[in-house]
Amino acid sequence: MKNILFRINELSKKEKVSGLTVDEKQEQQMLRQNYTQTFRGSLDSILLNTKIVDQNGHNVTPAALQDAQIRLKLSK
């Protein structure tokens, strides 16, 4: 993931200085899409393994998140 982000930044800097070729522009779009999908997947994974508890120790995880967690457990 670090190398993807490094290349995205490298292309962005080049775009500002001298512009990108058509191939570089396509590569930049593909890398950004790949990075975004990876980031969203990681965030989903984190959220699906999260439990929210108030100061009194009561589970206050939103119902939609609890439903998604149950569906995930059932699909395994």
From Swiss-Prot:
Top-level taxon: Bacteria
Record's GO cellular component terms: cytoplasm
Localization: Cytoplasm
InterPro entries on file: DUF896
Keywords for the protein's UniProt record, in alphabetical order: Cytoplasm
Pfam families xref list: DUF896 (PF05979)
Protein family membership: Belongs to the UPF0291 family.
Name of the protein in question: UPF0291 protein BCE_1981
Native organism: Bacillus cereus (strain ATCC 10987 / NRS 248)
